[in-house]
Amino acid sequence: MAVTVETLEKLERKMTLTLPLNTIQSEVDTRLKRLARTVKMDGFRPGKVPMNVVAQRYGYSVHYEVMNDKVGEAFAVAANEAKLRVAGQPRISEKEGAPEGELVFDAVFEVYPDVKIADLTQAEVEKVSAEVSDAAIDKTVDILRKQRRTFAQRAADAPAQDGDRATIDFEGKIDGETFAGGKAEDFQFLVGEGQMLKEFEDAVRGMKSGESKTFPLNFPADYHGKDVAGKQADFLVTVKKIEAAHLPEVNEALAKSLGIADGTVEALRADIKKNLEREVKFRLLARNKNAVMDALVANAELELPKSSVQAEVDRMIEGARADLKQRGIKDADKAPIPDDVFRPQAEKRVRLGLVVAELVRANGLQAKPEQLKAHIEELAASYEKPQDVVRWYLGDNRRMAEVEAVVIENNVTEFVLGKAKVNDKAISFDDLMGQN
């Protein structure tokens, strides 16, 4: 087999492969003989179809199949011998005018780039930290109490307040016409908790049982109901019942209802703190990981294989269509989504993937078995039956691959933070959780 490789531009290469025709024909004959032993054709017993008949019926498809296989095998061998790291699939075409007894093919493809990562000791990375405060524990206790609140009807002359549960009838009209979702009876919502539009809640707040009110309401331009978004409606609301919320006391009964065996408030708070610290750890790691990855991209020089970027764009478009389909959008799998929508993000992903792969290769940052085990056990710790969760991960190669990818990213993050100029920044628990 004769092979030549030519550089076309940047990462693009052209490989010319010359194969002896007899190797192709020999394999075609072998496959046709194998096929003849099992093929079924009218007028012949199984396995008794003459070779010339088999060749006439299947010769072209078998020849095409062998050509593809042989060229693919030859390309893989030649690329390996030339130490070419091929990105994507080659575009293969047969050349005309080949010498007698030979087949000549051109394979045009891209190679992965050499990745040059700048001196990481000069890179700057902001590393955030946060603590679980007593206030954060108090807020979680309040959330747990609200989840277990009960309601009791207020006196008839008691106005609706924030935290009350209101039972109402309402009807909305736009230009005198009712609209979908604009009418309901015995509808319940919690006043002041953002379940309804602010103008609606403001109108109901202060109303009493049996009272009716008409008021205008402006739907936001970005309202999820496109038919009413940006329009003004006139609502008629009648309050049928107002109920006050009663929160359970923070005591032994509450603690036991939340699974605390000894029922002490101290044990409840300790359990909440433990869970919050686990969540804080994951969120800090994710945030600091993003900062590290941004720094890596900013401190690396490389050309991007167009084929890799396009493959990532295609994956993202398919993901977007799948998401639209899950939301019930008709013909979502045919939705026209321009490549340019995802190209910048795809380029960033490909760039980051190549940089991380080089960093892992050059510094031995592959995931170790003990790291995989520890990470899975940490993920499983928050579940009622951790060992079942561990077995769930271990029993699926795809899930294990996802765990391995996370562990490698964690290794890279730790490695970079150990090299770079780190600017430590303490933030509040609420800032970390996005509650401010």
UniProtKB/Swiss-Prot annotation:
Q: Where in the cell is it found?
A: Cytoplasm
What is the protein named? Trigger factor
Q: Which HAMAP family match?
A: Trigger_factor_Tig
Where would one find the signal peptide in this protein? none
Q: Which domain of life does the protein's organism represent? A: Bacteria
Q: What is known of its domains?
A: Consists of 3 domains; the N-terminus binds the ribosome, the middle domain has PPIase activity, while the C-terminus has intrinsic chaperone activity on its own.
Q: Name one GO molecular function term.
A: peptidyl-prolyl cis-trans isomerase activity
